[in-house]
């Protein structure tokens, strides 16, 4: 938004933005793209990857086949990318880089959402401790660095440093040392690019608000319960006053739309204020500064209240816990079966060394969709 209230239609990059012409490069040297920027190329490679397509059949909260309207990792990633791009334009940073990070942030997620990730991590640590655990941010980086097989001259997607860095939201010191330059910020305690910060916050905006929508559609949470949540209650009351005859379903959609807008407007204003205070003149200045993207204290409290409500009432609902328990059993039994007899694996996933074998099994399971994991489990454990 300009000072006169007009909407920014073209994004002229600010001095603190990541400039695609000054990227820190790719792992494997390539000629520059002819009709795209480097960050556009990254975004396009992510969209065309096999891992991105598989997100359509991976869980957000509900198992993929539970309902046609529930969000999957793919629809969630698209929603994150839309929010992230809006934020990037408002702050005059690279929309293409922000979008690429947003689209790639869940590429390493297992089937069955966080339940699958937690169980796969437990299996790796208990049954193959020498191989290290499993963490979906690291797996997302592994997907784009190694596991995708689309190009003749290299494994992975060969993305720019800035995109790879943005994908890696969390990392232990041990893993950071193994990753080289892309892990350095976890050792020297610096920040990622502003584009990465925005993509991370866009993820939070998307999943909190859209999980409200899915939770209501499923019947696991109710409008009455949500009246306890300040940001929802306030906007729902405003909608009811303005549109007293509106059907509950549409009133809920209007409420969620307003909640998202509140978060985006606050995030934009707060981030711009921090940028003015710290006056970064370059992308490197952003890295040396404290986090520049963020919510105001008041809106952060409201967002945290909503997050806690969802944790207590949706993610811990007995029906979700039942799905979680089934998912954990499927992941654990698949891992145990493959580790006990690697001949059950497709040939491409068989390895000579035990440590390598465990990692290959985790790659195989992490790459499964919900329904593929269910079918694979049935093939191994059911007669007929």
Curated annotation (Swiss-Prot):
Limits of the HD domain: 73-208
One biological process term in Gene Ontology: dGTP catabolic process
Region spans: Disordered: 13-42
Keywords: Hydrolase
PROSITE patterns on file: HD
Entries under CDD domains matching the protein: HDc (cd00077)
InterPro entries: dGTPase, dGTPase-like, dNTPase_2, HD/PDEase_dom, HD_domain, PHydrolase_assoc_dom
Bilayer-spanning residue ranges: none
UniProt keyword annotation of Hydrolase present: yes
A molecular-function term among this protein's GO annotations: dGTPase activity
Pfam families to which the protein is assigned, alphabetical: HD, HD_assoc
Basic and acidic residues: bias regions: 28-42
HAMAP family in the record: dGTPase_type2
Family: Belongs to the dGTPase family. Type 2 subfamily.
Record protein name field: Deoxyguanosinetriphosphate triphosphohydrolase-like protein
Species of provenance: Bordetella pertussis (strain Tohama I / ATCC BAA-589 / NCTC 13251)
